[in-house]
Amino acid sequence: MCTVPTKRFGRRCALKLGALAALASLEACSSGSSASPTGTVGAAPTNGAAASPTTVSAGVATTVAPSAAATSGTGSAIASGRPATTAAASSVTTGTRPATVANVAGGNRPNIILINTDDLDTKSLPVMPKLKALMTDQGMTFPNYFVNVSLCCPSRSALLRGQYAHNNEVLTNGNPNGGYAHVHALGIENSTIATWLQAAGYRTALMGKYLNGYPASVADTFVPPGWTEWYSPVAGNAYSEYNYKLNENGKVVPYGKKPEDYLTDVIASKATDFIKRSASDPAPFFLYLPTYAPHGPATPGPKYENAFPDAKAPRSPAYNEQDVGDKPQWVQNMPPLAAKQQTTIDELYRKRIQSLQSVDDLIENVINTLKGVGKLDNTYIIFTSDNGFHLGEHRETSGKQAPYEEDIRLPLIVRGPGVAAGKSVEPFVGNVDFAPTFAQWAGATVPDFVDGRSFAPLLSGGAADAWRQTFLIAHYTAESRRGNRPAATGVPPRRQATPGGSAAASTPANGVPETDEEAEAAVGRGIPEFHGLRAKDYVYIEYATKERELYDLAKDPYELQNIAKTANPALLTQLSARLGDLQKASGATFRTVEAQPMPPLAS
């Protein structure tokens, strides 16, 4: 049972009573009464699923000449294997002709702010009252938002490039097939949403976590291409929120353990300063705010150390699943959760929701600052996470990377001009969709390697023409290999990462490893490589071990009954073929395949 806090908070805790009331709603989430297992609630720089048709509308190629600000001392702003000024516009399915710089340069192009939390699950949203009041109630929620690979570096790379992991080749958090050293060696930083928007005349800024292992094989002062302003940890213990160093536009600045050094608050302060400085600048901006919270160790901010003293992790029907005989071997190898493990899970849950209070404050500060400088009405604000997180479901202690709903389904809320307030839309949206969506808002050209599609039409109630009917999910291991991709993917031939880069690449912020729970889940418990299809009413998974999972989510939302062994063999053949087609596809071809109708479970 989920215990709601009843004791008076410590003097330093300044939470609203609304947060307490919201936490009570977790009872419903953990009681099994909900239809959804996840309980979704609603200084200047120095480096200068509804049914839909199956056809895909083609985009229109445009030419964007890089602005003077499109390059910096760190490298070319756009380099995707073709001249930047002739990159073809992706056939991103929007139902309308993609906007171009020529179309909108004379108009009032919107500002874009992306708040990307780390390891946030949907179960924790009820403890964020400011998020609800300022985002959920004022914007649009996407209950079917999924991530391709439920892991930090692959997810963030997909976000920046608009590509699935099998196409951008960022598969894990560390070498040989992931982490910053690998990303930098591939050269994919040279063509991202940052370079595209900067070339289109946007001021771009990142404040917070970039990619796991950054800066790894480059200097601590290195600023990746496309960023006008840059504030990201390069050393120390950023995950602890204290005792870290930031690369601030090419200058390394140390932060200590004083209350004012708390990283989430520092990010918020720099964000509001950037917005205030933007008030008199006619150029639109893209502000990327990737927080470290609530990633472990989930250190709470100074004001919230005593919040939610009695809270326990939600106990859904999937929590500490008793009968796992139908699950793949890696799940069967895990014994039921011991009492000590459950206590540890509850302790981590409390710290996570404590740390989220500072993220809630950040949201409020950003929105209030936008309102104060007159920019709110022309700014899209997006709130999401890099991946989901499990806390006891299916016998797993804590972490991500599994194919289950807790890990692959994430929060996504969008507020901005023309967005219907307090609404929810059902079509599938994924982390590969941010880049083409932002590009459409900005009137920027996107390269043809982009796999995602703009969800901008959904925000204004437009039809999801030729929209995806399934979403590709995957998990990779250190042994996973992908050869050189075809030129159409925009990824140059694989190059060996810098010698010695493996340890650095697997150690975020040059000294902070991923949590022990994640290492245990990915290695000790041996989650094999898998690929899967998340359809409207079911999910299908194939493992490298030849095992399969199939869940009827309409009848079994908590994924307790694997029906793969009793399913119609013809259906399994169809699903396997569709999965294979997607694993080989990229760009417009990928969008065509994923928009094809999915076979029903019952034939």
What are these regions (language model features)?
Residues 219, 225-237, 387-393, 432-435, ...:
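C-terminal cap/loop subdomain of S1 sulfatases and analogous C-terminal strand-loop tails that border
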Residues 1-28:
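N-terminal secretory signal peptides
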Residues 112, 118, 197, 209, ...:
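A short aromatic-rich beta-strand->coil structural motif
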Residues 37-100:
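Extracellular mucin-like PTS domains
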Residues 29-38:
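Bacterial lipoprotein signal-peptidase II cleavage site
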Residues 103-107, 117-123, 150, 234-262, ...:
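Active-site-proximal cap/lid insertion segments
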Residues 30, 95-97, 106-110, 117, ...:
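Long, internal low-complexity/basic segments
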Residues 114-115, 121-205, 216, 235-238, ...:
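Active-site segment of extracytoplasmic enzymes that catalyze sulfate/phosphate-ester chemistry
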